[in-house]
Structures are given as structure tokens and as C-alpha cells.
């Protein structure tokens, strides 16, 4: 799916008029075009399904070091910074830090690909819970491992700048698949690494 930049421009112009402003005044003349260009960038992930993102970043390596040596060995990354926009208010979700873990099953994925997946999934109209679920699904497809965990901490503009207006409020979500959800040893190890 391609993003319709021209339609966005027209609608932003209409929003400016609906707000009671003049889209032809000096400060706003190019605003519809700038907003459309920004949306094309920040919503790039909407152009791709989870399957397409999995295909895009499907660069793996054989993992002959930990095949059945220790079934609790995991790959863990944290502090991956992303942003997103909530689908309810189009408000920015910011200061988002993602932690991702998986237990390799003969294949490992390049570390930069993990961060790229998180970034691409965030570039959609989203819910924080769905970001975690989408990342987990994509990693499962690429690595062949059922054992994937995603922990996300973030702030939501819809909580901090409107409505209840509680700046500094953080939302933490977890997506635990496979043994991260069923094996206390694995989940305890994950939490130890996350809080370290």
C-alpha cells in the first residue's frame, strides 16, 4: 500500500480551515505539503504487512554454537529507541524503549535487523500492545523460534498533553511467547537482564 501524499495535503489544508486559520497565510502556505511529507516518513511501516517486514529483514545466520547446548541461552537487546502514533488520537508515543529477547533455534538474526524491525513496526498507527505483538510475530517468522519476548516502555501524548494531562506517565507492556510465558527460569532470566 502506498501512502497518498496528495490526499494528505488536501485534508491537512481542510483541517487548517476547520481550525479557523488561513492556509494561504505566510506561515502555513507549505504546511500541508510538509505534514504530508512527514506523514509519509513517520508512517512508512503502514506500507508493509508483518509478512513483508519479515521478508525484508530475513537475514539469518546458522547458529552452530548453541544448538541444543543450553536451551535457556537467549539473545537479549534493550534500550532500542522508537516512536509511534496512537491510532485513537494520532498522538505521538515517545520516549519508547524496546527490549527484545529470543531463544535461537538453529538460526540467529543480525542485531541491526532486530532494531530495524522495531523501528518499522512503530511507524504505523498503533497500540503499544500491538507493537510488541507485531515485533514478536515477525521475529518468530524469521528465526523459527517460538520463544520471543518484547517489553516496551513509553509515554503517550494522549495521556500527557490532553485529557488527563499526566506528564511523565509511563506505560509498560509485555509480549511473552513460548517459554518466556511458560518457563519460570527463562522468564526470571529475562527480567533479571531487563532490570540490570
UniProtKB/Swiss-Prot annotation:
* Keyword Iron carried by entry: no
Q: Which UniProt keywords apply?
A: GTP-binding, Hydrolase, Metal-binding, Nucleotide-binding, One-carbon metabolism, Zinc
Stored InterPro entries: GTP-CH-I_C/QueF, GTP-CH-I_N, GTP_CycHdrlase_I, GTP_CycHdrlase_I_CS, GTP_CycHdrlase_I_dom
**What GO CC annotations are associated with the protein?**
cytoplasm
Kindly tell me the pathway this chain contributes to: Cofactor biosynthesis; 7,8-dihydroneopterin triphosphate biosynthesis; 7,8-dihydroneopterin triphosphate from GTP: step 1/1
Xref: Gene3D superfamilies: 1.10.286.10, 3.30.1130.10
Task: Quote the record's binding site residues for Zn(2+).
Answer: 86, 89, 158
Q: Which domain of life is it from?
A: Bacteria
User: Which PROSITE patterns did the record assign?
Assistant: GTP_CYCLOHYDROL_1_1
Reactions listed under catalytic activity: GTP + H2O = 7,8-dihydroneopterin 3'-triphosphate + formate + H(+)
Can you cite a GO biological process for this protein?
one-carbon metabolic process
Coiled-coil regions, chain positions? none
Q: What EC number(s) would the UniProt record show?
A: 3.5.4.16
GO molecular function terms noted in the UniProt entry: GTP binding; GTP cyclohydrolase I activity; zinc ion binding
Q: How does it assemble?
A: Homomer.
Q: Which protein is depicted?
A: GTP cyclohydrolase 1
Amino acid at each position: 500500500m502506498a501512502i497518498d501524499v496528495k490526499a494528505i495535503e488536501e485534508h491537512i489544508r481542510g483541517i487548517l480551515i476547520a481550525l479557523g486559520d488561513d492556509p494561504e497565510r505566510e506561515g502555513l502556505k507549505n504546511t500541508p505539503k510538509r505534514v504530508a511529507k512527514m506523514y509519509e516518513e513517520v508512517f512508512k511501516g503502514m506500507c508493509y504487512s508483518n509478512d513483508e517486514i519479515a521478508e525484508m529483514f530475513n537475514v539469518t545466520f546458522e547458529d552452530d554454537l548453541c544448538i541444543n547446548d543450553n536451551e535457556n541461552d537467549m539473545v537479549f537487546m534493550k534500550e532500542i529507541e522508537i516512536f509511534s502514533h496512537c491510532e485513537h488520537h494520532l498522538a505521538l508515543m515517545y520516549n519508547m524503549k524496546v527490549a527484545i529477547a529470543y531463544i535461537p533455534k538453529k538460526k540467529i538474526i543480525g542485531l541491526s535487523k532486530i532494531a530495524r524491525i522495531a523501528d518499522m513496526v512503530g511507524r504505523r498507527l498503533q497500540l503499544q500492545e500491538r507493537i510488541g505483538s507485531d515485533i514478536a510475530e515477525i521475529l518468530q517468522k524469521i528465526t523459527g523460534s517460538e520463544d520471543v519476548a518484547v517489553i516496551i516502555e513509553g509515554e503517550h501524548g494522549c495521556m500527557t498533553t490532553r485529557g488527563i494531562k499526566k506528564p511523565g506517565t509511563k506505560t509498560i507492556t509485555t509480549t511473552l511467547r513460548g517459554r518466556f510465558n511458560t518457563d519460570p527460569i527463562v522468564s526470571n532470566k529475562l527480567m533479571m537482564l531487563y532490570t540490570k
